[in-house]
């Protein structure tokens, strides 16, 4: 559908005439900025949704359809009117530890049952992490040379939600911390560093930012798979608690989180988790200390640190609470579905 300016300019105008100027302005801006899916295309989308999705679902579970699929949103609203139960599984990383997370709160509020990966009453092991755990011997990381993969937060330039994550000028400040880290590591390590990012990061021109720091290797989520990425690198450093961080911890691949709390604010539970990770050097909140670690450790000492009993214990405990996996997850899922069948 095309934008219907006549519809948007005139709709509800007569109902606003007695409101204050600020209310009229907000309502006009709202109408003019509503996505086409919610106005011009809504009737057509509703018809498509009701013809595409099941008419009498016995079980409804999603981890992303509620925010990424406009047809699903319409369909699930119709199912809610019929009193169908709607289950949501956590979408990804940092949900459990964030001080405030509007998308996460929205997820928990709209679902009849919310499943976490370990920190709530209702728990459902991640199918993706479980599959990785079952097949972890297929993922071999580089044990011949120290090669760093730095995984960056590729948020949109203009945030569409409110959460304890760096946005706008705060995001630029977080880049300055990364700049200081890369300026403090030796040239050989810098030459052996690959930046992992998403295509959406083009809005920030991140590739140019890292190139100006002397980094010339890049890996995109959309074009390079996990197995190939793992095979090229020996140490992964994350600028945020991403789902990929959980995946590599599950695969037991050396991984470090560089996190300053002023950019990624934590709740009390998250603070406790991060303190434990900090004790065994899986987490750093200082780029100076992290640069010292990578400069003063070779591949052998990195592997020795990673395989240390205490490091492994803390890592496994963190996963059990925040990113649970289960090699027998299929039976776990079957039992969960049986308990939540729509009658």
What does each of the following model-derived ranges do?
Residues 127-211:
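Conserved catalytic-core segment of nucleotide-activated headgroup transferases in glycan assembly
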Residues 121, 194-251, 256, 261-262:
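Donor nucleotide-activated moiety binding/catalytic core segment of transferases
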Residues 69-71, 96-98, 121-125, 158-159, ...:
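Short, charged/polar "capping" segments at the starts of alpha-helices
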Residues 122-128, 143, 166, 211, ...:
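Catalytic binding pocket for nucleotide-activated donors in carbohydrate/polymer assembly enzymes
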Residues 319-343:
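C-terminal alpha-helical cap of glycosyltransferases
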Residues 42-46, 70-74, 166-185, 327-334:
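Well-ordered, non-membrane alpha-helical segments in soluble/globular domains
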Residues 72-79, 103-104, 204-215, 268-274:
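Short, aromatic/basic amphipathic alpha-helical patches
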Residues 1-134, 244-245:
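Active-site and donor-binding regions of nucleotide-sugar-utilizing enzymes
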């Amino acid at each position: 559908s095309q934008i219907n300016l006549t519809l948007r300019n005139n709709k509800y105008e007569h109902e606003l005439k007695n409101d204050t100027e600020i209310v009229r302005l907000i309502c006009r801006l709202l109408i003019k900025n509503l996505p086409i899916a919610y106005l011009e295309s809504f009737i057509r989308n509703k018809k498509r949704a009701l013809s595409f999705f099941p008419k009498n679902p016995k079980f409804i579970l999603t981890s992303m359809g509620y925010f990424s699929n406009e047809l699903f949103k319409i369909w699930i609203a119709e199912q809610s009117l019929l009193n169908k139960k709607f289950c949501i599984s956590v979408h990804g990383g940092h949900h459990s530890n964030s001080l405030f997370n509007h998308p996460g709160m929205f997820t928990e509020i709209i679902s009849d049952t919310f499943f976490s990966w370990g920190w709530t009453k209702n728990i459902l092991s991640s199918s993706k992490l479980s599959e990785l755990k079952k097949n972890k011997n297929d993922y071999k990381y580089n044990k011949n040379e120290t090669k760093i993969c730095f995984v960056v937060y590729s948020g949109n330039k203009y945030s569409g939600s409110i959460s304890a994550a760096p946005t706008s000028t705060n995001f630029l400040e977080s880049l300055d911390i990364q700049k200081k880290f890369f300026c403090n590591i030796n040239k050989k390590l810098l030459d052996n560093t690959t930046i992992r990012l998403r295509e959406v990061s083009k809005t920030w021109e991140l590739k140019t930012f890292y190139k100006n720091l002397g980094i010339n290797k890049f890996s995109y989520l959309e074009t390079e798979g996990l197995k190939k990425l793992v095979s090229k690198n020996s140490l992964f450093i994350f600028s945020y608690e991403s789902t990929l961080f959980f995946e590599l911890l599950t695969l037991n691949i050396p991984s470090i989180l560089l996190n300053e709390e002023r950019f990624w604010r934590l709740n009390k539970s998250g603070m406790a988790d991060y303190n434990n990770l900090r004790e065994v050097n899986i987490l750093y909140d200082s780029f100076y200390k992290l640069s010292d670690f990578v400069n003063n450790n070779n591949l052998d000492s990195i592997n020795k640190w990673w395989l240390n009993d205490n490091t492994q214990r803390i890592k496994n405990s963190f996963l059990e609470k925040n990113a649970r996996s289960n090699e027998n997850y299929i039976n776990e899922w079957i039992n969960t579905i049986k308990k939540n069948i729509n009658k």
